[in-house]
Regions:
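Tubulin/FtsZ superfamily GTPase core signature
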Residues: 1-242
């Protein structure tokens, strides 16, 4: 099955690239990774299979300066390259940390290209932590509104809800790593359903039927062991703050 379904994960902007690099490091397999950024210095070290420096003439590879409009225009400047890397895919996940310039602005353009190319297009994004400021949150909310119009299914993970599950003494760097881990779980959870045989047979047609033009979706995480593990894990996932 993994050879039959073409799955690609596109990380947009610094947050999206950090997320896909974390996925690669943790061994998410059966997918192709694509990194997109306006900041060449942040793009080049990425572990992604494909890297696209968008808006070269507009930003000279120096980034979007936290301006989503620059991110959007840069993606439009490079739309032929973006279209090429998503064409032929069955499923395209588009991930970003909403609130910055490149991720917020480019993610809707990337998703639009993927959907036009015929892929099931799933957005998986985070909203900023409260300590990142109101401007970043406002940018994120505007970006999510635009993004939601371009994807089949959108999963939004509020970082402030995530932080309520973490140690109050956690460092900012570790908090961002935890956000990357949640993005990994969201994407791996769906891709594994498609590529990994299980006790209940779910094929790509089933997934597509549920997720095509589905709108907003929610995810929860639960873990358990022992005799009632399925019920306990299910209840934990349902009540998960994220």
């Amino acid at each position: 099955m993994s050879n039959l379904v073409d799955i690609r994960v596109v990380g947009c902007g610094g947050g999206g690239i950090n997320a896909i690099d974390s996925m690669i490091t943790q061994g998410l397999s059966g997918v192709e990774f694509i990194a997109i950024n306006t900041d060449v210095q942040a793009l080049m070290p990425s572990l992604a299979d494909v890297k696209i420096d968008i808006g070269k003439e507009r930003t000279r590879g120096l980034g979007a300066g936290a301006d989503p409009n620059i991110g959007r225009l840069s993606a439009k400047d490079s739309i032929s390259e973006i279209t090429e890397v998503v064409s032929g895919a069955d499923v395209v996940f588009v991930t970003a940390g909403m609130g910055g310039g490149t991720g917020t602005g480019s993610a809707p353009i990337v998703a639009g290209c993927a959907k036009k190319a015929g892929a099931l297009t799933v957005g998986v994004v985070t909203t900023p932590f409260g300590f990142e400021g109101n401007k970043r949150m406002n940018n994120a909310l505007e970006g999510i509104n635009s993004f939601s119009k371009e994807v089949d299914t959108l999963i939004v993970i509020p970082n402030d809800n995530l932080i309520s599950m973490l140690d109050p003494e956690i460092s900012m760097q570790d908090a961002f790593k935890e956000a990357d881990n949640v993005l990994l779980k969201a994407i791996a959870g769906i891709s594994d359903l498609i590529t990994t045989p299980g006790q209940i047979n779910i094929d790509f047609a089933d997934i597509k039927r549920v997720m095509k033009n589905a709108g907003s979706a929610f995810m929860g995480i639960g873990y358990a062991t022992g005799e009632d593990r399925a019920e306990v894990a299910g209840n934990e996932a349902i009540t998960s703050p994220i």
